[in-house]
């Protein structure tokens, strides 16, 4: 049985919704139990892991097999009541011990391969995102000890078929699914319920006396604020895709400064007046980049290159190569302008700032000097 945090349902309109776990948790658990089996030389039918969010999962093991220096195990993906394309499929891990002292991670059958730049993984590598890579390697290292080496292969026999129901091909991930998950847990929640829970966090912070708030899309933004800006996480609230809603809630509650911090892939949509940033509502990332590059006098070849990109990261590589890094300060200023336009009928609109950062936590641009923004947030 998993811990109470996981077992507790999410309630929505009087209905209890069951949580699930990510493909990253499945791969981590499968790799851990395979490593344990090859060390102990017997089958194991249940395994527990601690997810990045601190939740303990106790999962049933399927198809366990051990022979000599190699073991294989599978975990069945369970998305809870948030069913997606990978729900119910088996995620396998094959662990082979060696004397290298290193842990190598491979993507096997049904795991997609990265074929384009722009998603934070090297071209040609398996589509296993950073957090699952870390949790897999950590779990295997704990199982085999500090000196042994191991080759870990993650595979999913249904992956090719299941991937056809995802956006992987559009992102240049071919041949299978992605192993993903920053928290390890899938939490089902309707949009309205989700928005209300985010707003509640704003209310709690305002009640505690805070009148300045940092709004971030998700975990990456929170980490950037803490590690790169040295700002107390107490002032940070996740806005997810609900930018306009959370800004309006911050105004309603009387916050006098709002700072939007995030990756351009999300925040540049605000520069186009898009205040719900989920892709099913609107995209316009490349169009926004092209328009503002043109305003800065960028040449047509660069505009063409950017317009043909599928991801913001890919476009950013072209922007950097052509020396148009000043675009990011321009976009940050434009984001603030758009926010103030949205609040033009507000009697006492808050001050607004924006900060853009890259996937490797480097500051790209800001509406004002970053030091001044950080200093005000720590007052």
Curated annotation (Swiss-Prot):
Domain of life: Bacteria
Keywords for the protein's UniProt record, in alphabetical order: Cobalamin biosynthesis, Methyltransferase, S-adenosyl-L-methionine, Transferase
Catalytic activity: Co-precorrin-5B + S-adenosyl-L-methionine = Co-precorrin-6A + S-adenosyl-L-homocysteine
A Gene Ontology molecular function term of the record: cobalt-precorrin-5B C1-methyltransferase activity
Pfam families: CbiD
InterPro entries, A to Z: CbiD, CbiD_sf
SUPFAM superfamilies reported for this sequence: CbiD-like
Pathway where it operates: Cofactor biosynthesis; adenosylcobalamin biosynthesis; cob(II)yrinate a,c-diamide from sirohydrochlorin (anaerobic route): step 6/10
EC number(s) on file: 2.1.1.195
A biological-process GO annotation: methylation
Top-rank EC class of the record's enzyme: transferase
Family matches, as NCBIfam families: cbiD (TIGR00312)
Family from the record: Belongs to the CbiD family.
Name of the featured protein: Cobalt-precorrin-5B C(1)-methyltransferase
Species annotation: Klebsiella pneumoniae (strain 342)
